């Protein structure tokens, strides 16, 4: 397949969504023979290469089956054509780059004094300087010269081309941002901002331009720029380019070229007040194929979510932006009446994020995932917006060996040869934070629900729901808090956990909620042999409430960063009824008029008690032992925490020392016949002891404490050799081997090309010709789209949007016409044109472009 076709395929398939039913409940049931469930392969062997080119060559030669790392265009197209023909290629726009600023103190006079007494003038504390960097960067140059065309300029975290993202991305256009930037404008604005700062009384005579660079007290003001050296063909040259641009603006740059381990530890694990860095070259994996993007607003721009400088960590200096927090929480938690209100709030938050410019996006990157075509015998499932994910290995098939075993060999990339960067902490917000380990544990986890990799629809998995049991009823705000009013009566005997008294209390009469839903739990078993049941859900809700609530200064069962993510969601829960049949019914303030499945998602409980936003899940036995290690102490005397705090040791269920302490704590819990306070009414001491013993047996056998519930379990970790084995889990996983491959098969469209007139006139019709294909996901074999495809273009102007249907010309060819009468109403200039294709009522394939009117 040619380079051009691969790039087009990547961009357009990212938006190829279609409507799918929630068939998660139709997996293997009672009577399914042992061995019929789980993944297609029996084992996965995961190793690491320190060079992407070597890993790619090993995949070509069959030394490994899948290179589970998204290569950029320069590496992939550096392979000879003969080698590429031996590969099954999955090109996905799943990567992106951004620049994170440390804006401390984020207020005039922009000077920060560290604990050592050293004073720094931070130019990135000036909002106008940060904002001007958007024009200092030539994004098109970065894509063309560094990514070799394998990506697109980006201004937001929303992947260009995916449904709904153009609404966010057009804000940058309205602000005047362009892919080429405007170096002259940027330098002028940075200079003006620094001149204004120099006139402040506190900086008078201290801040001045001396020769090429600005100085403070006679020393150059400096941006401490951490640049990822272990991405030598990507973020390293990109970082050096931006450093050169900053120096053109008179700001000296200290180029701190570090690998991912050191960089990540300094940027995300150290208090920004230490002033060890002020700018960082971030790289992101998409994390999921998305239908709704409010979570990205929270994650990438809102301080409450814990991804902005300071990480919402108690005791750290934290960037604050209350208006973004308010808008982001409102959308993320479903506190709105209409889809119009949802979009208005999100777009306002996006605009604030762009103008605050604490995190600046520069490009999306097409990642090329590859598999050996001879060894891997099928096209496995992958995320149209995030590439290889938790569904890839479960649906991949390989040729059996001489013993009849199917062993899949997968390779990761690490410049330093290490598989893991972050601690394996399944409770704290910082655990499992690197994409490498996330990719691995995702194969081992059956989450409560998932966003489908091909449609992004919220779909039941461990927890099941029927849309007939999902109801919403809301009215306008009557209290002045800006939130809708719930109109559903919550039963008086519904309960919530009270952390102060350590009891479950009835909510009483008069409580209302937006929505209610009933859920059942899929019949399944943890990897340690404990059955997953209602007690798992009761425990996790109690734990989340307890650790998110500070009951006095001496409360050790509280962690600020953890609370910052869980508290807003917990506040939406108005009450829950734990039903005698093992199901549960929740009453909650979450409204989503656009999608009823999303309403069901909003009321979910989960056995996952911590590590929000990560593809992890462990049973209550592990979580309780972790909690007691933190609050009671460890046998070794180590002081543990569920956060990255340099003064303590972060929990790590793969670290031998931490595992030893967890075993000691579990044995202590056995001796005491300990029953967690959250489930004291749902469990007898003997049942708790039996659960602890099963967990201990798993840890003893496999040497780690990542007990989960997915289609694979981690059967071996060799941190010295950077080698892992995942083994098929069949006894307690409820879905048949071939279930997911059939479930995800989907006929979708993709827009291959949009021919927009180069010299459109306002006194003549504008004719747009579109080339559209169709294919059955996850296959890459396309054919011209037939007449059942519905195609349209939407012209976006300052006055709004107007859609124009495209007529079917022949298979693969469609034509839309924008009448001259409509164009005559517009002023000369450039207008965004969004092309869409679909088969039915599903979200469309989307391709944005520009119509220039003369």
What are the language-model segments listed below?
Residues 23-50, 81-95, 395-399, 416, ...:
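Aromatic-rich, solvent-exposed beta-strand/loop patch
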Residues 24-42, 75, 82-86, 123, ...:
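Surface-exposed, Gly/Pro/Thr- and Asp/Glu-enriched linker/hinge segments
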Residues 32-78, 252, 738-769:
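Ligand-site clamp/hinge motif
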Residues 48, 122-131, 135, 179, ...:
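Extracytoplasmic/peripheral linker and loop segments enriched in polar/acidic and small residues
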Residues 76-200, 210, 215-217, 305-325, ...:
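Local pocket/hinge segments that shape ligand/substrate recognition
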Residues 84-115, 264-330, 761-763, 767, ...:
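Acidic-aromatic pocket-rim loops
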Residues 125-248, 348, 393-411, 420-426, ...:
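Append "and occasionally in soluble cytosolic enzymes with long acidic Gly/Pro-rich linkers
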Residues 297-301, 305-308, 368-418, 428-434, ...:
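Long beta-strand-rich cores associated with HINT superfamily self-processing modules
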């Amino acid at each position: 397949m040619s380079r051009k076709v691969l790039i087009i395929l990547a961009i357009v398939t990212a938006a190829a969504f279609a409507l799918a039913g929630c068939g998660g409940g139709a997996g293997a049931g009672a009577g399914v023979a042992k061995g019929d469930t789980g993944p297609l392969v029996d084992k996965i062997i995961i190793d690491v290469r320190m060079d992407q080119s070597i890993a790619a060559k090993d995949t070509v030669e069959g030394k490994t089956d899948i290179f589970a790392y998204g290569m950029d265009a320069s590496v992939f197209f550096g392979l000879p054509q003969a080698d590429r023909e031996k590969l099954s290629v999955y090109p996905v726009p799943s990567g992106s780059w951004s620049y994170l600023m440390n804006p401390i103190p984020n207020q005039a006079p922009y000077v920060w004094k560290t604990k050592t007494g050293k004073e720094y003038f931070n130019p990135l504390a000036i909002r106008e300087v940060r904002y001007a960097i958007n024009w200092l960067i030539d994004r098109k140059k970065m894509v063309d010269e560094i990514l070799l065309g394998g990506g697109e300029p980006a201004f937001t975290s929303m992947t260009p081309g995916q449904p709904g993202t153009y609404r966010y991305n057009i804000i940058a256009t309205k602000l005047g941002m362009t892919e080429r930037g405007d170096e002259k404008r940027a330098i002028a604005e940075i200079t003006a901002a620094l001149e204004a700062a120099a006139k402040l009384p506190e900086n008078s005579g201290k801040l001045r331009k001396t020769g090429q660079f600005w100085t403070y007290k006679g020393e150059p003001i400096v941006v401490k720029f951490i640049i990822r050296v272990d991405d030598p063909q990507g973020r390293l040259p990109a970082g050096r380019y931006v450093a050169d641009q900053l120096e053109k603006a008179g700001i000296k740059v200290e180029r701190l070229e570090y690998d991912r381990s050191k960089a990540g530890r300094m940027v995300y694990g150290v208090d920004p007040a230490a002033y060890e860095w002020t700018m960082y070259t971030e790289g992101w994996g998409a994390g999921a194929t998305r239908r709704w993007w409010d979570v990205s607003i929270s994650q990438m721009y809102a301080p409450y979510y814990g991804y902005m400088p300071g990480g919402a960590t108690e005791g750290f200096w934290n960037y604050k932006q209350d208006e973004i927090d308010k808008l982001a929480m409102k959308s993320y938690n479903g506190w709105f009446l209409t889809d119009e209100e949802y979009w208005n709030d999100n777009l306002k938050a996006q605009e604030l994020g762009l103008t605050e410019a604490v995190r600046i996006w520069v490009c999306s990157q097409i990642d090329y995932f590859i598999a050996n075509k001879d060894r891997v015998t099928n096209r496995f499932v992958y995320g149209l917006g995030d590439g290889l994910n938790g569904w890839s290995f479960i649906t991949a098939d390989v040729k059996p060996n001489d013993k009849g075993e199917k062993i899949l060999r997968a390779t990761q990339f690490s410049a330093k040869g290490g598989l893991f960067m972050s601690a394996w902490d399944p409770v704290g917000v910082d655990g499992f934070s690197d994409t490498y380990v996330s990719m691995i544990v995702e194969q081992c986890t059956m989450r409560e629900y998932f966003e489908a990799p091909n449609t992004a629809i919220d779909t039941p998995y461990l927890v099941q729901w029927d849309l007939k049991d999902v109801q919403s009823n809301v009215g306008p705000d009557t209290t002045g808090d800006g939130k809708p009013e719930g109109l559903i009566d919550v039963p008086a005997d519904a309960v919530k956990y009270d952390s102060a008294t350590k009891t479950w209390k009835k909510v009483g009469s008069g409580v209302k909620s937006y929505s209610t839903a009933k859920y059942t739990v899929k019949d399944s078993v943890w990897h340690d042999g404990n059955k997953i049941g209602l007690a798992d859900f009761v425990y996790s809700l109690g734990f989340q409430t307890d650790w998110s609530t500070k009951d006095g200064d001496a409360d050790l069962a509280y962690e600020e960063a953890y609370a910052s993510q869980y508290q807003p969601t917990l506040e939406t829960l108005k009450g829950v009824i734990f039903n005698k049949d093992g199901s549960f019914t929740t009453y909650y303030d979450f409204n989503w008029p656009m999608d009823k499945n999303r309403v069901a998602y909003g009321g979910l409980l989960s056995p996952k008690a911590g590590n929000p936003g990560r593809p992890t899940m462990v049973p209550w036995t592990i979580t309780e032992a972790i909690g007691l290690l933190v609050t009671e102490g460890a046998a070794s005397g180590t002081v543990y925490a569920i956060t990255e705090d340099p003064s303590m040791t972060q929990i790590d269920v793969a670290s031998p020392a931490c595992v030893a302490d967890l075993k000691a704590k579990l044995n202590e819990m056995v001796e005491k016949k300990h029953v967690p306070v959250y489930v004291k009414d749902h469990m007898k001491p003997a049942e708790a002891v039996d659960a602890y013993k099963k967990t201990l047996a798993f840890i003893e056998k496999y040497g780690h404490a990542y007990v989960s519930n997915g289609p694979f379990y981690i059967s071996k970790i060799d941190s010295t050799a950077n080698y892992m084995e995942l083994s098929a889990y069949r006894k307690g996983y409820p879905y048949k081997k071939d279930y997911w491959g059939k479930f995800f098969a989907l006929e979708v469209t993709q827009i291959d090309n949009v021919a927009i007139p180069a010299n459109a006139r306002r006194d003549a019709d504008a004719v747009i010709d579109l080339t559209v294909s169709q294919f059955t996901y996850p296959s890459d074999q396309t054919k011209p789209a037939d007449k059942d495809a519905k195609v349209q273009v939407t012209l976006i102007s300052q006055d709004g949007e107007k859609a124009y249907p495209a007529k079917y010309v022949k298979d693969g060819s469609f034509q839309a016409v924008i009448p001259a009468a409509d164009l005559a109403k517009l002023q000369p200039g450039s207008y965004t044109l969004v092309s869409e294709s679909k088969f039915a009522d599903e979200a469309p394939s989307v391709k944005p472009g520009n119509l220039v009117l003369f």
